[in-house]
Protein backbone atom coordinates (compact mmCIF):
# COMPACT_ATOMS: atom_id res chain seq x y z
CA UNK A 1 0.00 0.00 0.00
CA UNK A 2 1.38 3.40 -0.98
CA UNK A 3 0.20 6.80 0.21
CA UNK A 4 1.76 10.09 -0.88
CA UNK A 5 2.06 13.74 0.01
CA UNK A 6 3.65 16.68 -1.76
CA UNK A 7 5.73 19.08 0.33
CA UNK A 8 6.67 22.28 -1.52
CA UNK A 9 7.51 20.38 -4.69
CA UNK A 10 8.88 17.34 -2.84
CA UNK A 11 6.93 14.12 -3.27
CA UNK A 12 7.22 11.84 -0.24
CA UNK A 13 5.52 8.45 -0.36
CA UNK A 14 4.63 6.32 2.66
CA UNK A 15 5.55 2.73 1.77
CA UNK A 16 4.78 -0.57 3.45
CA UNK A 17 7.51 -2.72 1.88
CA UNK A 18 10.63 -2.79 -0.27
CA UNK A 19 8.41 -3.38 -3.32
CA UNK A 20 6.46 -0.21 -2.48
CA UNK A 21 9.72 1.75 -2.20
CA UNK A 22 10.86 0.48 -5.58
CA UNK A 23 7.50 1.37 -7.17
CA UNK A 24 7.55 4.85 -5.60
CA UNK A 25 11.13 5.46 -6.77
CA UNK A 26 10.37 4.24 -10.32
CA UNK A 27 7.40 6.62 -10.46
CA UNK A 28 9.18 9.78 -9.37
CA UNK A 29 9.08 9.92 -5.57
CA UNK A 30 11.68 12.25 -4.09
CA UNK A 31 11.71 10.55 -0.69
CA UNK A 32 9.94 7.65 1.03
CA UNK A 33 8.99 6.66 4.54
CA UNK A 34 9.47 2.90 4.91
CA UNK A 35 7.13 1.09 7.31
CA UNK A 36 5.52 -2.27 7.75
CA UNK A 37 1.86 -2.86 8.64
CA UNK A 38 0.45 0.37 7.26
CA UNK A 39 -3.01 -0.88 8.25
CA UNK A 40 -1.86 -0.37 11.87
CA UNK A 41 -0.62 3.14 11.16
CA UNK A 42 2.88 1.95 10.26
CA UNK A 43 5.31 -0.15 12.27
CA UNK A 44 9.08 -0.68 12.20
CA UNK A 45 10.13 -2.30 8.90
CA UNK A 46 12.56 -5.19 8.71
CA UNK A 47 16.21 -4.35 8.24
CA UNK A 48 16.17 -6.55 5.12
CA UNK A 49 13.50 -4.33 3.53
CA UNK A 50 15.69 -1.28 4.18
CA UNK A 51 18.85 -2.94 2.87
CA UNK A 52 17.13 -4.05 -0.36
CA UNK A 53 15.59 -0.61 -0.85
CA UNK A 54 18.95 1.16 -0.32
CA UNK A 55 20.68 -1.22 -2.74
CA UNK A 56 18.16 -0.68 -5.54
CA UNK A 57 16.78 2.85 -5.07
CA UNK A 58 18.58 6.17 -5.00
CA UNK A 59 16.20 8.31 -2.95
CA UNK A 60 16.27 9.16 0.77
CA UNK A 61 14.53 6.59 2.95
CA UNK A 62 13.09 7.59 6.32
CA UNK A 63 12.23 4.53 8.42
CA UNK A 64 9.46 4.25 10.98
CA UNK A 65 10.38 3.08 14.47
CA UNK A 66 7.20 1.91 16.18
CA UNK A 67 6.99 -1.57 17.73
CA UNK A 68 3.20 -1.95 17.84
CA UNK A 69 -0.08 -0.29 17.07
CA UNK A 70 -2.32 1.02 19.81
CA UNK A 71 -0.88 4.26 21.07
CA UNK A 72 2.41 5.99 21.67
CA UNK A 73 3.04 5.49 25.38
CA UNK A 74 5.65 2.74 25.67
CA UNK A 75 7.04 0.55 28.44
CA UNK A 76 10.73 0.77 29.28
CA UNK A 77 11.38 -2.49 27.40
CA UNK A 78 9.56 -1.22 24.30
CA UNK A 79 11.48 2.06 24.49
CA UNK A 80 14.85 0.30 24.69
CA UNK A 81 13.87 -1.90 21.75
CA UNK A 82 12.95 1.21 19.76
CA UNK A 83 16.36 2.78 20.41
CA UNK A 84 18.05 -0.44 19.27
CA UNK A 85 15.84 -0.60 16.16
CA UNK A 86 16.76 3.01 15.33
CA UNK A 87 20.47 2.35 15.81
CA UNK A 88 20.35 -0.74 13.57
CA UNK A 89 18.32 1.00 10.86
CA UNK A 90 20.70 3.99 10.88
CA UNK A 91 23.69 1.64 10.63
CA UNK A 92 22.08 0.08 7.56
CA UNK A 93 21.52 3.34 5.72
CA UNK A 94 18.29 4.92 6.93
CA UNK A 95 18.33 8.61 6.06
CA UNK A 96 16.17 9.43 9.05
CA UNK A 97 13.85 7.98 11.64
CA UNK A 98 10.14 8.71 12.13
CA UNK A 99 9.08 8.12 15.74
CA UNK A 100 6.91 9.47 18.55
CA UNK A 101 6.86 9.19 22.33
CA UNK A 102 3.99 10.46 24.47
CA UNK A 103 3.34 10.47 28.20
CA UNK A 104 0.20 9.00 29.73
CA UNK A 105 -1.32 12.50 29.80
CA UNK A 106 -0.83 12.99 26.03
CA UNK A 107 2.21 15.26 26.10
CA UNK A 108 5.57 14.87 24.36
CA UNK A 109 7.77 12.54 26.43
CA UNK A 110 10.70 14.94 26.56
CA UNK A 111 13.42 12.62 27.90
CA UNK A 112 12.73 9.78 25.48
CA UNK A 113 12.26 12.14 22.55
CA UNK A 114 15.54 13.89 23.34
CA UNK A 115 17.43 10.61 23.55
CA UNK A 116 16.04 9.45 20.20
CA UNK A 117 16.80 12.80 18.52
CA UNK A 118 20.36 12.72 19.89
CA UNK A 119 20.84 9.18 18.55
CA UNK A 120 19.54 10.15 15.11
CA UNK A 121 21.55 13.37 14.93
CA UNK A 122 24.72 11.57 16.06
CA UNK A 123 24.39 9.65 12.78
CA UNK A 124 23.84 12.92 10.89
CA UNK A 125 20.28 11.96 9.94
CA UNK A 126 16.80 13.49 10.11
CA UNK A 127 14.62 13.19 13.25
CA UNK A 128 10.93 13.14 12.27
CA UNK A 129 8.24 13.19 14.98
CA UNK A 130 5.36 11.24 13.45
CA UNK A 131 1.59 11.34 13.88
CA UNK A 132 1.79 10.67 17.60
CA UNK A 133 1.69 14.47 17.45
CA UNK A 134 -1.99 14.25 16.49
CA UNK A 135 -2.72 12.72 19.91
CA UNK A 136 -1.16 15.49 22.02
CA UNK A 137 -3.46 17.58 24.18
CA UNK A 138 -1.79 20.96 23.48
CA UNK A 139 -0.33 21.18 19.99
CA UNK A 140 1.36 24.57 20.27
CA UNK A 141 3.15 23.48 23.44
CA UNK A 142 4.12 20.23 21.70
CA UNK A 143 5.59 22.06 18.68
CA UNK A 144 7.61 24.28 21.00
CA UNK A 145 8.87 21.23 22.90
CA UNK A 146 9.92 19.51 19.67
CA UNK A 147 11.69 22.65 18.47
CA UNK A 148 13.60 22.93 21.77
CA UNK A 149 14.53 19.23 21.59
CA UNK A 150 15.88 19.59 18.05
CA UNK A 151 13.35 17.65 15.95
CA UNK A 152 13.74 18.36 12.24
CA UNK A 153 10.20 17.71 11.10
CA UNK A 154 6.68 16.95 12.38
CA UNK A 155 4.13 14.84 10.51
CA UNK A 156 0.58 15.85 11.43
CA UNK A 157 -2.95 16.17 10.12
CA UNK A 158 -3.58 18.99 12.58
CA UNK A 159 -4.96 16.61 15.20
CA UNK A 160 -7.77 15.42 12.93
CA UNK A 161 -8.33 11.99 11.36
CA UNK A 162 -7.26 13.33 7.96
CA UNK A 163 -5.49 16.38 6.51
CA UNK A 164 -8.64 17.88 5.00
CA UNK A 165 -10.46 17.82 8.34
CA UNK A 166 -7.45 19.29 10.15
CA UNK A 167 -6.44 21.79 7.48
CA UNK A 168 -7.25 24.92 9.53
CA UNK A 169 -5.12 23.79 12.49
CA UNK A 170 -2.39 22.51 10.18
CA UNK A 171 -2.22 25.84 8.34
CA UNK A 172 -2.13 27.69 11.67
CA UNK A 173 0.78 25.57 12.93
CA UNK A 174 2.66 25.89 9.64
CA UNK A 175 2.35 29.68 9.53
CA UNK A 176 3.14 30.13 13.23
CA UNK A 177 6.26 27.92 13.26
CA UNK A 178 7.36 28.03 9.61
CA UNK A 179 10.83 29.42 10.27
CA UNK A 180 11.54 27.08 13.19
CA UNK A 181 10.52 23.57 12.12
CA UNK A 182 9.07 21.83 9.07
CA UNK A 183 5.47 20.76 9.70
CA UNK A 184 4.02 18.56 6.98
CA UNK A 185 1.02 16.42 6.19
CA UNK A 186 1.29 12.65 6.54
Task: List each model region and its residues.
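Short, acidic/polar
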Residues: 16-23, 78-88, 137-144
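Residue-level detector of conserved catalytic or cofactor/ligand-binding positions
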Residues: 181-186
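Active-site mouth loops of central-metabolism enzymes
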Residues: 6-16, 67-81, 128-138
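Conserved beta-strand positions in the central sheet of alpha/beta enzyme cores
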Residues: 12-14, 31-33, 62, 98, ...
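Glycine/small-residue-rich loop that forms an oxyanion/phosphate-binding "nest" at active or ligand-binding sites
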Residues: 60-110
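Conserved, mostly hydrophobic/aromatic
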Residues: 24, 89, 130, 154
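Active-site-adjacent beta->alpha loops and helix N-cap segments on the catalytic face
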Residues: 39-57, 103-119, 136-141, 161-174
